[in-house]
Amino acid sequence: MKDAEDALPARIPIFPLSGVLLLPDAKLPLNIFEPRYLDMVRDAMAGDRVIGMIQPRPKTSPGLARSPSLLAEVEKPAVYGIGGAGRITAFEETKDNRFEITLTGLSRFAIIEELAVTTRYRQVMADWDRFAGDRWAEEEATGVDRSRLLTALRAYLELARIPAEWETIAKAETSSLITSLAMICPFGPSEKQALLEAHDLFERSRIMTALVEMSLLHRASGGGEDDDDDGDHRIH
């Protein structure tokens, strides 16, 4: 990932997907079935294979009338200014004409501007300079309180009834563990965005620990399941 062949393009397609983030070196499997994103993957495969994952911003309170502006927001939602880009490193076309792909994280990016395009999918000009360290430096886990994080995580997963392979977790490098948890744990979009935008591994670990501990307090006080936890999750 650190070689010159991984130079990143100024113009990239974006795939808005709530609750999903892609961090450098991480693997993100995706099931592509919507026509515009099938187009996006075909075009990416014919080019540099780079796709930018980005979250839609939380919707404003909907009005009673479905105005043209609201309809446009559904079709083309406002997105956060920062996302994570990856390169397609695995591709398979299924018998029912879906694409099953894997993105390997390259770098975060900031949107300079969204382009007026004729493609059905959206494209942006990306600024990579702000996150140059994503590509050229190996992050160290200096200062990370791994013990505190894992203690809170174990209680959180048991309470949420999320299975975890603790033997694998115990052996994982701290940097890989934090990256995996940030991507897999069922936090809400704003919390996921905070994890994505964290300056470094230490800051991301502090945010992760705080989120897990706050969720524990919420559940322990009778708050029940988190509103955004509506999927099947496994930590490994």
Q: What feature does the model see in each segment?
A:
Residues I169-F187:
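Core structural elements
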Residues S147, S175-T179, R206:
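Non-catalytic, well-ordered alpha-helical scaffold segments
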Residues M1-E165, S190, L201-R204, A210-H236:
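Positively charged
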